[in-house]
Amino acid sequence: MSWQVGTIGNLATLQRGYDLPDSAREPGPFPVVGAAGPNGFHSEARTAGPGVTVGRSGGSIGKVTFVSEDFWPHNTCLFVTDFKGNDPRFVAYLLGTLNLAQLNSGAAQPSLNRNFVYGVRIRSGLY
């Protein structure tokens, strides 16, 4: 394996999570994962596990969570929609080693824009 310089955009594709007000939650087995990690359950999953989320708003901006099962990614996080052939656990580990909070693009409310994340340079044996 040779290590290459690339970007997060080479490693994975991110998408903003889905809205789910507390009033719309229905009891169920699927974790709802937000900026700070799991924050409840719902009757429906929006994406298959394993998955990786990154906190995109508030005090948990940049927090990385690995999710082993199907789940609902909440709108307070970004989630990986395409691992581009890379191992999800390694992607979670690598993202967790980066200081993604430094990419804050918000003013009063911290916010993480996936387009800024894509350009972060990394060195990896993946891609």
Regions found by a protein language model. Give the residues of each.
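A short beta-sheet element
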Residues: 34-96, 100-101, 105-118
